[in-house]
Structure formats: C-alpha cells, structure tokens
C-alpha cells in the first residue's frame, strides 16, 4: 500500500480544500441511473460486476483516492479496494467485507468469490477483519429504487473518500437501469470530477460487459 502525502501549500486545490474543508465544510451527493442492460443480458452477477467497475474508475482518478490517513496526513493512495456490505437474511443484519482489487474482472471475481466463501456468513460489522486503510465503502439497497439519497454524517466532514450506494434496478424504455448514489467531499471532488466518473463508469460497463447480441 502506497500513500503519497500532499503538500497543501503547493497543491493546486489548496484554496478550494481550505474553503470546503475548514471554512464551509461541504459534502454532497447525487444519484445517477446507470444502463446495465448488457450486463444483465450476459447473466453476470450484478454485485461483483459493479464493485469491479466502480473500483476500476476510482483507481483511475486521484480525487477519488484522496484521504486523510490514520496519521492525520492529507494525501492519496496509489490503489483502492472496495469494502462492501452483505446482508444476513436470518437476523436481518449486515456485515462488511473487503476484497482485493484486480485489473482483470475474472481475477477480481475470483477474489470476491473466495471472500464470500470465507466470510459471507460471518456476523458483526466487519465480516472480514482487518480492512486496510485504502478501502472505500460500497453498499446496496436491492429492495427499492430511488432518485435521491443522502448520508448524514455528523462527524464525517473529514472523511474525503467517496461513498457509493446502489439501489434496485428497474426497466425503462427497454433498458435496465440501476440507481447509483455517490457521496463525495467537495474539498477534493467537484461536479466536473463526479460527472466524469459517471461517464467513464458507464463506458466501462458497456466495454467490459458487451451485449451478447453484438
């Protein structure tokens, strides 16, 4: 794990970070309907495919890897890994599992499946223990679709990493759409960066999981 400290005095975002981190602490969220038609047509498992795609784009851009590490240093990680929730039907609780990222989907899927076998039934907040500091949170609410979603974190204004929440997919105009809520910190991520992320995520979904009819 590599963490590169940021020199705030020479950082191009110094003024913006100071404003949205210290003067007017600000996080924001938005929901985007992603076209997952081809992914569903292929019969791929939705959760690991989305975890892979999201993490791939997170690892492309520094603004989604910028954080304050346990030592209190501002900087960015070279690579991130997803930490995601799994639901326990028997007692209606959930646990968090983290999976090591791999650039190739089949390799990531193998890591995911191994973690599910080992930790999928483990109870408690952390089903898989000892998550590394270079993880980011992902969750899914598969029982409901939504067009708005927001996390209210009372002490979360020093949390700089993105938070992703997926909802229930639905049909519209012949397409299968998946709502994805993304919460980011304005000190490191502007609207431009968020929209670029979504555009690249949508493109990757079509590229990595092309329609079998093509």
Protein language model annotation of sequence segments:
Residues 88-146:
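Helical lid/core segments from catalytic subdomains that handle acyl or acyl-like groups
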């Amino acid at each position: 794990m590599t963490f590169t400290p940021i020199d705030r005095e020479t950082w191009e975002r110094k003024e913006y970070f100071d404003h949205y981190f210290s003067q007017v602490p600000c996080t924001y969220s938005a929901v985007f309907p992603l076209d997952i038609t081809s992914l569903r047509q292929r019969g791929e498992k939705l959760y690991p495919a989305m975890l892979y795609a999201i993490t791939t784009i997170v690892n492309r851009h520094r603004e989604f890897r910028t954080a304050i590490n346990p030592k209190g240093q501002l900087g960015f990680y070279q690579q991130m890994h997803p930490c995601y929730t799994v639901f326990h039907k028997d007692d209606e609780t959930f646990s968090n599992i983290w999976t090591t990222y791999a650039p190739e989907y089949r390799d990531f899927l193998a890591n995911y499946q191994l973690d599910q076998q080992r930790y999928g039934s483990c109870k408690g907040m952390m089903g898989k223990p000892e998550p590394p500091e270079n993880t980011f949170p992902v969750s899914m609410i598969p029982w409901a679709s939504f067009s708005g979603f927001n996390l209210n974190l009372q002490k979360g204004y020093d949390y700089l990493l993105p938070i992703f929440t997926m909802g229930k997919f639905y049909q519209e105009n012949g397409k299968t759409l998946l709502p994805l809520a993304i919460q980011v910190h304005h000190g490191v991520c502007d609207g431009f960066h968020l929209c670029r992320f979504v555009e690249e995520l949508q493109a990757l979904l079509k590229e990595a999981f092309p329609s079998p009819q093509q």
